[in-house]
Amino acid sequence: LARALDYFSSEKFHECLVLLQPLNRRYKLNPRYRAYLAVCLYYEWEYAEAIRLFDEVIPQLQGVAPHELSLYYWMDAESYFALQQYDRALPLYEKMLPLCRDNEKPDAYYRLGFCHLFAAESSGASEKASGSSESSGSSAEERKKAKECFELSLEGYLKYRNTPNEKARIAQIRHMIGGLK
């Protein structure tokens, strides 16, 4: 276990995973170590397995530091997002927001914007398929929420992360907001 934790703290997630998985099968590790295992799975792109573990252990980790918990929410949400389960990712990004640092919020709002945008597309398509005569009420609401999230994201990027590396992201967000008017 000590070697696995050394690998984890050195961000050698594959090596940590190789050691933690058999330990967890044999001894049923405590929730924090299983969260570390979920982090390793996330970095190995094993999103379904990471989700299973994060969803199991996050409710048991309410006593950890807020920032640590926010990272677990982020990775859980990102795993759902990667699997295109945006409706499942959305509440996890929302739970992360009050716990994370201010300079991390733009990324969460950016993803939330996409979750709402995909929900708008989904509800618009289902309303069209059902022949609903309503003018996409929930679709319009989701688009409004998406725009609000993208605006909050842009505000955060401009305030905390306005660097040459983020110029393309900032430009993209501006275009997204323009497209949602």
Regions found by a protein language model. Name each.
Residues 29, 68, 104, 142-145, ...:
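Structural signature of alpha-solenoid helical repeat junctions
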